[in-house]
Amino acid sequence: ADFILASSKLADEGYNPNNKLMFVEPGIYKFQDILLNGIEVPHDRFGGRRFGMATVWSWEQNNLKIVHMGGAAGEIDINSQIILSRPDILFISVGGGIKSYNGNEASQIVKILKPSIVIPVHFVRGKNIIDSCDFSNADLFLKNMKDFKVKYLGKKFKINSKRIDKNTIYIFKD
């Protein structure tokens, strides 16, 4: 990776072991030919009063608008909705916990932003729930996303910007 996009620098996040170029603060940044837009959103369900604010990232790459909301847990204001709306690809946390959207919250954000492709993150894969982890699996999110088809993938996949699967959720199995 050439750089790291992080949502926050909390003690359990934003780890940068190789001291790579890392973007974490809200703002507009340019890396080579990619313009990164970091938008501040609550990192909790209390308007940021518990865990502060997180950074949600949006950028264009290969003619695709990409939004990454892995570190968001709170509501997004109307200005952020306008900036983030209609991405080709939306990465969004769905597993719940104290610092990320649960399946109900994530499905509401998807309905507001209207992405073509959704890639869920921050959830427990499979049916096994780990006692020491406050994430759940993606079942609740998928239950709320009846208008989307679901495709299960291996470790990687390619997207053709000229032929995007509309209303599709991609879930990585590994």
Protein language model annotation of sequence segments:
Residues 1, 86-89, 99, 103-123:
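Proline-aspartate-enriched helix->loop->beta-strand connector
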Residues 3, 10-12, 18-85, 89, ...:
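Core dinuclear metal-dependent hydrolase active-site scaffold
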Residues 9-28, 109-113, 130-149:
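Ligand-binding grooves and catalytic loops that recognize ribose/phosphate and carbohydrate rings
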Residues 50-51, 117-174:
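Binuclear metal-ion centers of metallo-dependent hydrolases, dominated by the metallo-beta-lactamase
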Residues 56, 80-84, 106-110, 138-142:
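Short amphipathic alpha-helical segments and helix-helix/interface helices
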Residues 78-80, 102-104, 131-135:
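Conserved strand-to-helix beginnings and helix N-cap segments that scaffold or border functional pockets
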